[in-house]
């Protein structure tokens, strides 16, 4: 499943999302969700062993956070990568 989070990392939506993430899922942080890059202790970085965390590059750049993505082993994806993630997952859940 692809989880798309546009809320800040310490929001109720983020907490609910993290409670449903399972191994093999992907998380895509967009809009205010990219603020998670500011928090080394955000639980999403260690949600599950086999969870892929991606960050929408355009939103990270707009907030001056693209350079810190490597700290969390997050994958920066552009809009093409966003589309590819939606093609890779049969289920998509947006957390707004």
Spans of features found by a protein language model:
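Short, glycine-rich nucleotide/cofactor-binding loops
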Residues: 2-14, 31-36
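Short internal beta-strands
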Residues: 25-32, 51-59
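Histidine-anchored nucleotide/phosphate-binding helix
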Residues: 9-22, 27
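Short, conserved loop/helix-junction motifs that constitute active-site signature segments
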Residues: 19-23, 42-50
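Conserved phosphate/oxyanion-binding catalytic-loop motifs
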Residues: 59-65
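Secreted/extracellular ectodomain signature
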Residues: 23, 32-33, 37-39, 77-80
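C-terminal structural segments of small proteins and small subunits
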Residues: 65-96
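Short, basic, glycine/proline-bearing loop/turn elements
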Residues: 1-3, 24-31, 66-68
């Amino acid at each position: 499943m692809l989880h798309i989070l546009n809320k800040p990392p310490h929001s109720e939506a983020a907490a609910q999302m993290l409670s449903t993430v399972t191994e093999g899922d992907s998380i895509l942080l967009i809009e205010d969700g990219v603020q998670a890059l500011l928090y080394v202790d955000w639980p999403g970085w260690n949600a599950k062993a086999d969870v892929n965390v991606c960050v929408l590059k355009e939103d990270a750049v707009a907030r001056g956070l693209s350079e810190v993505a490597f700290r969390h082993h997050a994958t920066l994806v552009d809009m093409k990568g966003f589309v590819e993630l939606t093609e890779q997952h049969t289920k998509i859940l947006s957390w707004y």
